[in-house]
């Protein structure tokens, strides 16, 4: 095989020539984490063992919006994951029972912009941004275009 000596290309025939989305870009002297690396890391680092009902009003008409909420027994935290695959910002009307007041939450946001990628020259162009916010689960939530947002709270 032509690319047998290259580890990244070794299994090229098994990819069925679909779009190849690497998690790392390996150069001669450096390795750069891509947005897909950070996306996989956000899923891996924010798992839960108890699934909860996080209702979104009028979600039937929304395409490419995904919401899941759960409780992690190990860290004793609630985790809310929101994914917007649309190219425009979306406002969601939430209705989560049992959370009647505002709470402090850790917010992790990964936003993708067309044409903006991590490269060896700009290794941190796309990466998650972490902040502490006040969250009200009975008010509207804004989702940036092409983004994944994770809220962690007690």
Please state what every model-predicted region is.
Residues 63-101, 107-112:
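Carbohydrate-binding surface patches
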Residues 142-153:
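Short Pro-Gly-centered flexible turn/kink motifs
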Residues 99-144:
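Acidic, Ser/Thr/Pro-rich beta/coil linker or hinge segments at domain junctions
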Residues 6-10, 77-80, 148-150:
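Beta-sheet entry/capping signal
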Residues 61-65, 88, 134-137, 145:
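Residues that act as N-cap/strand-start positions at coil-to-secondary-structure junctions
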């Amino acid at each position: 095989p032509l690319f047998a000596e290259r580890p990244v290309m070794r299994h090229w025939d098994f990819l069925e020539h679909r779009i190849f989305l690497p998690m790392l870009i390996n150069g001669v002297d450096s390795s750069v984490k891509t947005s897909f690396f950070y996306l996989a890391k956000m899923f891996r680092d924010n798992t839960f063992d108890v699934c909860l009902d996080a209702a979104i009003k009028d979600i039937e008409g929304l395409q490419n919006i995904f919401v899941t909420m759960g409780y992690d027994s190990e860290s004793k935290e609630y985790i809310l994951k929101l994914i917007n695959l649309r190219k425009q910002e979306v406002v969601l009307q939430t209705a989560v029972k049992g959370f009647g007041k505002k709470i402090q939450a850790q917010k992790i946001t990964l936003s993708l912009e067309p044409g903006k990628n991590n490269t060896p020259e700009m290794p941190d162009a796309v990466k998650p941004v972490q902040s502490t916010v006040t969250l009200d689960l009975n008010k509207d939530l804004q989702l940036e275009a092409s983004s994944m947002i994770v809220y962690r709270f007690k």
